[in-house]
């Protein structure tokens, strides 16, 4: 709706309204340093200054902001079965774990004919990849922001600003995403009079860098080694028949006649 001009087209996802310090009102230097657990380090610096004309009126001001953050993110290592899974950790043929990707692919040998050739096989899953093996938990974030303010009148300002962001981290959306070397650029020009009006034009550009979907990547990686059809219908079953079935048939009480398949 009309608020898109003010908050942006994705405002329905939620809005955080941030008003940055005006260099005419808040000049000077500010420095920030934080440390914390998980090797967290955050540092930042702001420098702002204003200039007056011959009449002693403030006409031009600028500000520059820099911030950098690094930390080791928590690893997603939940190996419990996903909600609604038909198999548990006790299923020797595997199960679909929360933070293991690619193991969503499931096969079964539960038909009567397959019970004869592959006794005890039941449901079995592709091995997949654990998230910790395919993503980088070393989060990094760099932000730069600059602005030039010009007072056309004492209460009317023309502002140009440029913002840049770069980083690597893990993002939770519909899937798990590894945001790697992602970049954001924003240019904005604005004419405003405090508490009366503003006219704003801006452009935001982004470059996903080397980012990727962790779940899709895991599936593609295991398909490179062996397709789902090749792995489930041939390789795994052949291995089971050659190395597991002989031992199963030697178990005490293993039936040797056909009626057991019913």
Task: Give residue ranges: language-model regions.
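Periplasmic plug
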Residues: 1-2
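Outer-membrane beta-barrel translocator/receptor signature
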Residues: 5-87, 139-142
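Outer-membrane beta-barrel domain signature, strongest for Gram-negative TonB-dependent receptors
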Residues: 91-262
């Amino acid at each position: 709706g009309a608020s898109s001009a003010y908050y942006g087209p994705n405002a329905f996802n939620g809005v955080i309204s941030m008003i940055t310090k005006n260099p005419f009102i808040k000049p000077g230097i500010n420095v920030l340093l934080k440390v914390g657990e998980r090797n967290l380090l955050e540092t930042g610096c702001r420098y702002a200054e204003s200039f007056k004309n011959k009449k002693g009126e403030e006409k031009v001001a600028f500000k520059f902001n820099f911030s950098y953050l690094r930390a080791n993110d928590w690893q997603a290592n939940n190996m419990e079965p996903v909600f609604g899974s038909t198999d548990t950790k006790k299923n020797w043929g595997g199960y679909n774990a929360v933070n293991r990707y690619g193991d969503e692919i499931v096969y079964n040998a539960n038909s009567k004919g397959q019970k004869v050739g592959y006794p005890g096989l039941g449901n079995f899953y592709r091995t997949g990849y654990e998230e910790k093996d395919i993503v980088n938990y070393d989060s990094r974030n760099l932000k730069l922001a600059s602005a030039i303010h010009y007072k056309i009148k004492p209460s009317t300002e023309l502002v140009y600003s440029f913002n840049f962001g770069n980083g690597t981290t893990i993002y939770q959306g519909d899937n798990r995403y590894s945001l790697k070397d992602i970049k954001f650029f924003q240019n904005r020009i604005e004419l405003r009079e405090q508490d009366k009006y503003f006219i704003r034009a801006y452009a935001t550009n982004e470059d996903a860098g080397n980012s990727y979907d962790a779940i899709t990547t895991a599936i593609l990686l295991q398909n490179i080694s062996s397709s789902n059809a090749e792995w489930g219908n041939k390789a795994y079953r052949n291995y089971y028949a050659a190395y597991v079935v002989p031992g199963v048939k030697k178990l005490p009480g293993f039936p040797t006649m056909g009626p057991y398949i019913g």
